[in-house]
């Protein structure tokens, strides 16, 4: 918490590498300190506190995370797959992205003689990728975080 607070005051760009590892450490800590429901209560409150602390008007905050494919049951009985940020527990499952302004998913696109590393900028119906309207004209852009940050700076200038 102190490191994040200090970074948000002193840096223009803050990178949280990796949110997934942070959640793993958080659950391990909670399991050492608490039992039963108190483990999940501590875990969920800590995630909420962290997500809230990252919201600011000064710094651009970049969070990396591992994604997972989750089967979702529809009211009709059918299923569909969705790809989203992986977290343990149910409270924040599928909900982390709603706290973020921009969500990019990495994609590896293989051509006949090439491999292209990309960011997916908006949902294809499976991912929870999202960007502000008009920020990027293409569904896939080069995997270059500097370009993304420069685009954000121009967009909000």
Residue ranges and their predicted role:
Residues 1, 32-33, 144-145:
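General structural signal for secondary-structure boundaries
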Residues 6, 22-25, 103-106:
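Conserved, well-folded catalytic cores of nucleic-acid-processing
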Residues 9-11:
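Short, high-confidence coil segments that cap the C-terminus of an alpha-helix
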Residues 13-95:
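P-loop NTPase motor core
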């Amino acid at each position: 918490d102190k490191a994040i607070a200090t970074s948000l005051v002193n840096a223009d760009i803050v990178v949280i590498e990796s949110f997934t590892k942070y959640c793993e450490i958080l659950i391990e800590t909670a399991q050492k300190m608490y039992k039963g429901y108190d483990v999940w209560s501590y875990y969920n409150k800590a995630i909420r506190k962290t997500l809230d602390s990252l919201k600011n008007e000064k710094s651009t905050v970049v969070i990396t995370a591992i994604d997972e494919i989750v089967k979702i049951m529809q009211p009709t009985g059918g299923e569909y797959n969705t790809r989203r940020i992986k977290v343990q527990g149910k409270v924040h499952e599928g909900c982390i992205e709603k706290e973020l302004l921009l969500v990019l998913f990495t994609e590896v696109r293989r051509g006949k003689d090439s491999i292209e590393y990309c960011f997916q900028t908006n949902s294809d119906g499976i991912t929870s990728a999202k960007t502000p309207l008009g920020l990027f004209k293409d569904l896939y852009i080069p995997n270059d975080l500097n370009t993304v940050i420069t685009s954000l700076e121009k967009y909000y200038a």
